[in-house]
């Protein structure tokens, strides 16, 4: 079975070293039970109509959840990811053309003091 697009983006980011220092999760955030651990969550976020033999856009949401009181580290990771995608929009043939949607969004804080950035990407893919 072909991996889902959020799994392909996770693999692409992992291969490029963008997930280093993060516990990688899929679909939903699961508290690692350790405030010193940063987490990156990959999940699907909709897209355009999927038609046979035509390209479609698949949207992927990547939550970058920083360790407690490590806000600058989380922001640096977010900027590295955005820079990587801008410089390498066709680095992975399984992803197709990837681009960031909405740049870097305003962060939110969790009750525990973790900073969260929700990055969204559009992947144009077709066979």
Feature-to-residue mapping (PLM):
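Charged, amphipathic alpha-helical segments and their flanking helix caps
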Residues: 1-23, 43-127
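Short acidic low-complexity segments
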Residues: 25-34
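A short, polar/charged loop/turn motif at coil->beta-strand junctions and beta-hairpin connectors
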Residues: 33-36, 54-56
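A short, hydrophobic beta-strand-centered structural micro-motif
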Residues: 35-45
């Amino acid at each position: 079975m072909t991996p889902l697009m959020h799994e392909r983006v996770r693999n692409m980011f992992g291969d490029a070293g963008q997930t280093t220092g993060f516990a990688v999760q899929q679909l939903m955030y699961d508290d690692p039970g350790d405030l010193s651990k940063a987490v990156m969550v990959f999940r699907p976020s909709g897209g355009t109509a999927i038609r046979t033999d035509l390209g479609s856009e698949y949207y992927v949401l990547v939550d970058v959840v920083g360790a407690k009181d490590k806000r600058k580290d989380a922001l640096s990771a977010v900027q590295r990811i955005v820079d990587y995608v801008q410089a390498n929009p066709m680095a992975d043939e399984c992803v197709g053309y990837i681009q960031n949607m909405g740049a870097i969004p305003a962060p939110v804080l969790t009750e525990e003091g973790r900073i969260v950035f929700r990055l969204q990407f559009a992947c144009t893919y077709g066979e």
